[in-house]
């Protein structure tokens, strides 16, 4: 069981307490921490849609500290980020690996950030299947299509040639924040909130 801190806000009308994540949501900040799965995806998609309905012209920030997870859950978040009107800024705190790195790179161009000690890792999709040979072949073909699709999007996000992406995701490819900036996964390494120090 995890402990979620409460914060108290005082206004002229009295006090109101929020859990910390609700208070951050009020500031248009979404946290993606831990595994990307159906539950976290549904929560983030709902928050993105809610924030768009509140103000379609104001940016939304997603702070990412995730080892990755489900491709379909991650693609639901990705598609919603592209679908909504507000720009979605992405910030890596800690680690963005696998689907976490994919989502980090999918933020609005010019608004993708990493903190100085963040670590980013890209690799090809993982899959483990068992059953009849024909079923295994169906799943293998599906994962190859997914790999091709993810590589094309990563190529667009980073401005790296598709062949470079294909080679670089063959194995786990770990990068520092500065290396991720040079690669095109993020636009800036920031040390201060706001405009930050451009590295």
Swiss-Prot record:
Quote the cellular component terms of the Gene Ontology held in the record: cytoplasm; endopeptidase Clp complex
Q: Which domain of life is it from?
A: Bacteria
Query: Can you cite a GO biological process for this protein?
Result: protein quality control for misfolded or incompletely synthesized proteins
Under the heading CDD domains, the entry gives: S14_ClpP_2 (cd07017)
Checking InterPro entries in the record gives: ClpP, ClpP/crotonase-like_dom_sf, ClpP/TepA, ClpP_His_AS, ClpP_Ser_AS
Keyword list, A-Z: Cytoplasm, Hydrolase, Protease, Serine protease
Q: What is its EC number?
A: 3.4.21.92
Q: Which GO terms describe its molecular function?
A: ATP-dependent peptidase activity; ATPase binding; serine-type endopeptidase activity
HAMAP family cross-referenced by the UniProt entry: ClpP
**Which family does the record assign?**
Belongs to the peptidase S14 family.
Q: How does it assemble?
A: Fourteen ClpP subunits assemble into 2 heptameric rings which stack back to back to give a disk-like structure with a central cavity, resembling the structure of eukaryotic proteasomes.
> What is the protein's name according to its record?
ATP-dependent Clp protease proteolytic subunit
Q: Which organism is it from?
A: Clostridium botulinum (strain Alaska E43 / Type E3)
Q: State which gene encodes it.
A: clpP
């Amino acid at each position: 069981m995890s402990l979620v801190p409460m914060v108290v806000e005082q206004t002229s009308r009295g006090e109101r307490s929020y859990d910390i994540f609700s208070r951050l949501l009020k500031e248009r900040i979404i946290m993606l921490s831990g595994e990307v799965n159906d539950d976290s995806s549904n929560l983030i998609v709902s928050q993105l849609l809610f924030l768009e309905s509140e103000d379609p012209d104001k940016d939304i920030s997603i702070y990412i500290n995730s080892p990755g997870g489900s491709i379909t859950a991650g693609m639901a978040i990705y598609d919603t980020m592209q679908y909504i009107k507000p720009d979605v800024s992405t910030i890596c705190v800690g680690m963005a690996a696998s689907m976490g790195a994919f989502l980090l790179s999918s933020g609005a161009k010019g608004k993708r950030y990493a903190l100085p000690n963040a670590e980013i890792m890209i690799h090809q999709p993982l899959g483990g299947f068992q059953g009849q040979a024909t079923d295994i072949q169906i799943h293998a073909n599906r994962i190859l299509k997914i790999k091709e699709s993810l590589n094309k999007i990563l190529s667009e996000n980073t401005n790296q040639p598709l062949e470079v992406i294909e080679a670089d995701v063959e194995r786990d490819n770990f990068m520092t924040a500065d290396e991720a900036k040079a690669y095109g996964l993020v636009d800036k390494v920031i040390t201060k909130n706001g405009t930050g120090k451009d590295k």
